[in-house]
């Protein structure tokens, strides 16, 4: 083959390969910084029953991860009182992301009901795609351990929260979606980030916030079956503070409502 033609084809290959493989999923972070600390009141909802359930927190710190600067985001959910006696939730979720908000490591230690599980997902970025090593231990027994390769940007539970805080919703209308990939257990699934419009939300710090309403829906590979995963109310400003976060459990949902926030970026 003519050398000039070969070089031209290589150029096209580099330019037009999927963004997930070559662009490596880099995002400019404009919404949070080292030292952000948000505390929440938790509410358990099952059917028509809603009860105060405990406390939660979302903390962000800048740390050293394998010799490089990284964001460490830690979410704690701890139920107590009557709701806690009905269905216990004591979860610790930790995510490490590089300075471009690419997930590096995610761990979840969860006591939910009478069960204990531990999940670990580690991400590596190579020329031929993204490798995700994932494993889960459930009640002391290993359920799976495998490595998945993908060419699209893929997020865990906490890095997806960092993602939606930095998306631009300016030109979106209610019903609009952004499609991403999400790691769920041993599978990479399709996820839609749904824009549901604007709303005023009163938080437990006594303030009323203008918020952007977001929900995230997980689809199967054929986009036929779906389930709601997370929904959030984010402040309609540069900080995109999660004022309310709804997380779906095996039974019911846990709602986190902002109680206090400090260390804001903007």
Regions found by a protein language model. Give the residues of each.
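Bacterial N-terminal signal peptides that target proteins for export
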Residues: 1-8
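Bacterial N-terminal signal peptides
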Residues: 8-16
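Alpha-helical structural elements
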Residues: 11, 27, 35, 150-152, ...
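Sec/Tat signal peptide C-region and signal peptidase I cleavage site
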Residues: 19-23
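Acidic, serine/threonine-rich low-complexity disordered tracts
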Residues: 24-125, 169-266
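Active-site/ligand-binding surface loops and adjacent short beta/alpha elements
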Residues: 126-185
